[in-house]
């Protein structure tokens, strides 16, 4: 049972409260039994599960509750709160300082995904505008430097290592000195792992740590070992000053929940989680948003962060056009590019309320990305006049020969081109209506600039454009309106970013 299954089972248990006519002790106990069973199946320690059950029971006294209170919501809130506590170590995680040289040393057992995770962390900060680099001080595993070199080259991250020097302390020291002299902000050092916790591994870790004096030591933990993570994390903490933990392989193992709760029990803050093989299958770990996404409640704050990463604030020309209700094929092409930059579709969908982390399978995700690339390939075969025309699809309807030319140039059928134009027309019509809403593109809090009736019209337009299944997952019109309200408040008028979001 992977994490998505755990989320689905707990959500199903909580949903049973809505189906019950009367909320009594029997209904509460049945729901808690389902939640606890799901946690035990995910290899969460039985003591932690019992504690969660007792805490919820003590927080909810059905007999003492006033009749006007919403018992369902209070029970759901109590369960949510306890699930957050389950994965929260209660310790603030270390964060790098911008403009400073932050040395991060990675430790862990062999096979935990340490080298790949080094590259993922460097890439994560690089995308956020930090100057990052990688150092391979793993001289024990054959091919470690080749792997790091390959990952770094693919992501265009500077790296340092040696095929001849066998002393990891020398390599780490030289690499850190080199990158400090070049004013790198994030300096990541990968160290040797072993198949088990050998004394020689700990001794080597201490030597490297003493030589480079890292600002943060990150322990990389394999989620597949479940609650055994606790003993392993404690063993490393006793030997070196482990400040943070990254849990890997959470995408495909039944014991992910057990691993997360076990690490939290050691009071070690989890800073990131690995959710796949690709370099962007990597997410910051924040307890409340994590549980919120797990239960299909979304993470609007995380979504806004993703949008802001795109640096869409510079796109003043597009905003000016939107004010006047104009949207060209080139604009749509650029929005598709923004979506591609935001990372895996499943990661983005998990941030939208109503979608669980399992809504889009890996196969569906690849299919969606392939479709998006196909649409962009079609637009690559269009000329400037077609891409920049404010008449949009009318240019093609007036001269059907253009459709045949674009189809030939992009290697698709004329029907594919027509489908693209139909999709574009829907977007353009919505933008035209948005342009008529005064205050929508004004600075400040959008909820104050736009009237409720205007926002209702905009929501209706969005609902018409959406796949009915998607709208259903969001909780219908009420769910869409709730999400838009959250987005307004969180984005504080950042409508520029929302354009990248609306086109998903």
Swiss-Prot record:
SMART domains (alphabetical): AAA, SRP54, SRP54_N
E.C. designation(s): 3.6.5.4
Binding annotation for GTP: 108-115, 190-194, 248-251
Keywords: Cytoplasm, Endoplasmic reticulum, GTP-binding, Hydrolase, Nucleotide-binding, Nucleus, Ribonucleoprotein, RNA-binding, Signal recognition particle
Region (NG-domain), start-end ranges: 1-295
InterPro entries: AAA+_ATPase (IPR003593), P-loop_NTPase (IPR027417), Signal_recog_part_SRP54_M_sf (IPR036891), Signal_recog_particl_SRP54_hlx (IPR013822), Signal_recog_particle_SRP54_M (IPR004125), SRP54 (IPR022941), SRP54_euk (IPR006325), SRP54_GTPase_dom (IPR000897)
Keyword hit for rRNA processing: no
Keyword flag Nucleus: yes
Region (M-domain): 296-504
Catalyses which reaction(s): GTP + H2O = GDP + phosphate + H(+)
Disulphide bond pairs: none
Subcellular localization: Nucleus speckle; Cytoplasm; Endoplasmic reticulum
PROSITE patterns on file: SRP54
GO molecular function terms noted in the UniProt entry: 7S RNA binding; ATP hydrolysis activity; GTP binding; GTPase activity; ribonucleoprotein complex binding
Gene Ontology BP terms: exocrine pancreas development; granulocyte differentiation; neutrophil chemotaxis; SRP-dependent cotranslational protein targeting to membrane
A GO cellular component entry from the record: endoplasmic reticulum
Summary of subunit composition and partner proteins: Component of a signal recognition particle (SRP) complex that consists of a 7SL RNA molecule of 300 nucleotides and six protein subunits: SRP72, SRP68, SRP54, SRP19, SRP14 and SRP9. Interacts with RNPS1. Interacts with the SRP receptor subunit SRPRA.
Comment, domains: The NG domain, also named G domain, is a special guanosine triphosphatase (GTPase) domain, which binds GTP and forms a guanosine 5'-triphosphate (GTP)-dependent complex with a homologous NG domain in the SRP receptor subunit SRPRA. The two NG domains undergo cooperative rearrangements upon their assembly, which culminate in the reciprocal activation of the GTPase activity of one another. SRP receptor compaction upon binding with cargo-loaded SRP and GTPase rearrangement drive SRP-mediated cotranslational protein translocation into the ER.
HAMAP family, alphabetized: SRP54
Stored PANTHER family: SIGNAL RECOGNITION PARTICLE 54K PROTEIN SRP54 (PTHR11564), SIGNAL RECOGNITION PARTICLE SUBUNIT SRP54 (PTHR11564:SF5)
Task performed by this protein: Component of the signal recognition particle (SRP) complex, a ribonucleoprotein complex that mediates the cotranslational targeting of secretory and membrane proteins to the endoplasmic reticulum (ER). As part of the SRP complex, associates with the SRP receptor (SR) component SRPRA to target secretory proteins to the endoplasmic reticulum membrane. Binds to the signal sequence of presecretory proteins when they emerge from the ribosomes. Displays basal GTPase activity, and stimulates reciprocal GTPase activation of the SR subunit SRPRA.
Family note: Belongs to the GTP-binding SRP family. SRP54 subfamily.
Protein name: Signal recognition particle subunit SRP54
